[in-house]
């Protein structure tokens, strides 16, 4: 059955890749994005790759009145909610902006959904809700705690969505806790395109490799890990996007409230990522060790077994593919979508 899905933040990195997978799975898609950390041209690439025109509304989801009108006009059956600010370090400097964007924006979205009787939502949560885990790999039933305002917004939103479901069992909610999405579309024409200096490791590394930035800053080499640098579970953005399509199948069956980790189950350190990117690029990538960032933790990787058992989903693309695809995108488009 073809569903119409409204995707907030659908012009962003994960959003665009998910829109492609949704269209290829036979769904209609409507995108809402304020373009604060994304680019309208990314959706033109999506349309070129899929051959399908994607209705787009340049709207901030805090604008509830406009959202209501969009829901009335488009009548989506479900929402995949990506929109929000997403940088750990930045969130410690400007927490109020994170609470305003992420919390107020989502409450506004949920009001518009409820008023239009659209009660199916897949929420883009994060592994940051686990805080600094006692052990790894991380299971969905681990205790939740957060070490920074970004993570706190994700945890608060999980709680808000849980409360809504408890109050009204007509809601179907899937909380997807992502680990660290990297890579790019295999075409090399769609990838991570941050506005300004990247906050995330991979686009920073690729921008150094392409000569836009001088060297990679490695935040701390004194963590309790094999080489002293932070370990994360990096997942190919296309695998992550496919996880949303799998979650949508689950939600269509009147599933209630469900939580899944979306990761590979394997951790790589910052230095290992740089080494893998050097192989993809074919030359050394300069880096220097600097102080730790506030809010960062030593090691974080998933146990994705629940998603495999219940959604029939697992990550398929390895770290080599992630780095090669990220480099193909960056080398073809050194200035992102402006090229």
Task: Locate the predicted segments by residue.
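Residue-level signature of the cytosolic catalytic core of signaling kinases
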Residues: 59, 63, 194-198, 266, ...
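Short, electropositive, low-hydrophobicity segments enriched in small/polar residues
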Residues: 13-19, 42, 88, 109, ...
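C-terminal substrate-binding subdomain of Rossmann-fold SDR/epimerase-dehydratase oxidoreductases
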Residues: 202-339
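Secondary-structure transition/hinge residues
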Residues: 75, 117, 165, 169, ...
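Short-chain dehydrogenase/reductase
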Residues: 99, 147-155, 191-199, 203, ...
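N-terminal Rossmann-like NAD(P)+-binding domain of SDR-like oxidoreductases, especially those catalyzing
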Residues: 1-184
């Amino acid at each position: 059955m073809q569903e119409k899905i409204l995707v907030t933040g659908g012009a962003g990195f994960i959003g665009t890749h998910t829109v492609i997978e949704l269209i290829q799975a036979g769904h209609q898609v409507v995108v809402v994005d304020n373009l604060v950390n994304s680019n309208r041209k990314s959706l033109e690439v999506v349309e070129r790759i899929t051959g399908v025109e994607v209705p787009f509304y340049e709207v901030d989801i805090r604008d509830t009145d406009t959202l209501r009108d969009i829901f009335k006009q488009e009548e989506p059956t479900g929402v995949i909610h990506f929109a929000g600010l997403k940088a750990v370090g930045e969130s410690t400097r400007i927490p109020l902006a994170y609470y305003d964007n992420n919390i107020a924006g989502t409450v506004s979205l949920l009001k518009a959904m409820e008023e239009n009787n659209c009660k199916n939502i897949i929420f883009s949560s994060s592994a940051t809700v686990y805080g600094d885990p006692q052990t790894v790999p991380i299971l969905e039933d681990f205790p939740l705690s957060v070490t920074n305002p970004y993570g706190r917004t994700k945890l608060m939103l999980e709680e808000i969505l849980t409360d809504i479901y408890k109050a009204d069992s007509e809601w179907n909610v899937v909380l997807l806790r992502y680990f660290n999405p990297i890579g790019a579309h295999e075409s090399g024409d769609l990838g991570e395109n941050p506005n300004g200096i990247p906050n995330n490791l991979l686009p920073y590394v690729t921008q150094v490799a392409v000569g836009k930035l001088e060297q990679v800053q490695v935040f701390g080499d004194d963590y309790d890990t094999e080489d002293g640098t932070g370990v994360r579970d990096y997942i190919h953005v296309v695998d992550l996007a496919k996880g949303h399509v799998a979650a949508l199948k689950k939600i269509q069956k009147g599933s209630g409230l469900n939580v899944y980790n979306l990761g590979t189950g394997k951790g790589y350190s910052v230095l290992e990522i740089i080494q893998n990117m050097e192989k993809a690029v074919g030359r050394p990538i300069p880096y220097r060790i600097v102080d730790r960032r506030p809010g960062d933790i030593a090691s974080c990787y998933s146990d994705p077994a629940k998603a495999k058992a219940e959604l029939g989903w697992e990550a398929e693309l390895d770290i080599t593919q992630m780095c090669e695809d990220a480099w193909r995108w960056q080398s073809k488009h050194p200035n992102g979508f402006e090229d």
